[in-house]
Amino acid sequence: YQASTSELYGEAKKKPQDELTPFNPASPYATSKLFAYWICKNYRDAYNIFVCNGILFNHESERRGETFVTRKITIGLSKLVLGLQKKLYLGNLDALRDWGHAKDYAEMQYLILQQKKPDDYVIATGKQHSVREFIHEALSHFGIELKWSGKGLQEKGVISRITKNEFKSKDIKVGKEIIAVSKEYFRPNEVPDLLGNAKKARRKLKWKYKIGFKELVRK
């Protein structure tokens, strides 16, 4: 099994992306993963080796590295309400991703390897959310609502409503700016829009994800 990535598609012209969508890698990472994809496919076709590519869209869990945006959001917001951090800086708030849970995706990887014939599969939920939506959902667990003002690098998230009063930090109050945008966190050649179509996996593997977006954020 070879773990491919949705980054293979780059700025794809087709949406959602499936196994037949042309690849258009936009970063050194994606280019290296495309090489691995084709090596597996070539060896399978030439030497009849049982090898499969799983094209995984974004998958998260409690063990996700803290440098990734989802963990950066959840850890940063936790520090804010504990008074350990004053503000959370992020990049593109409108980047769109197809987020699933690693547990569901690991199950599909197992199913891929139980088939009689090797093949390649997209692993995705088919549901898309923005970084901004992830922030709002994470804040809902603290009873905090945001309003946004400004545009681009001047955009900021300000507390508009609080429904819980269990914060150690006295800075958590209506009108407090807690989210800011920084050019430091805009990646070069960032892919702004990814959405997967796992129809083939649902049909051939009888696979379906169980953990939705709201539960994923909660976990």
Task: Please report, for each region that a protein language model flagged, where it lies by residue.
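Short coil/loop residues immediately preceding or within conserved phosphate-binding loops
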Residues: 3, 20, 26, 85, ...
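Short, small-residue-rich loop/turn micro-motifs
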Residues: 5-7, 13, 94, 198
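PG/GG-rich flexible active-site loop of Rossmann-like NAD(P)H-dependent oxidoreductases
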Residues: 7, 58, 129
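Catalytic helix-loop patch of NAD(P)-dependent Rossmann-fold dehydrogenases
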Residues: 7-53, 61-64
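A short, flexible beta-alpha/helix-coil linker loop
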Residues: 57-60, 96
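C-terminal substrate-binding subdomain of Rossmann-fold SDR/epimerase-dehydratase oxidoreductases
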Residues: 64-72, 76-219
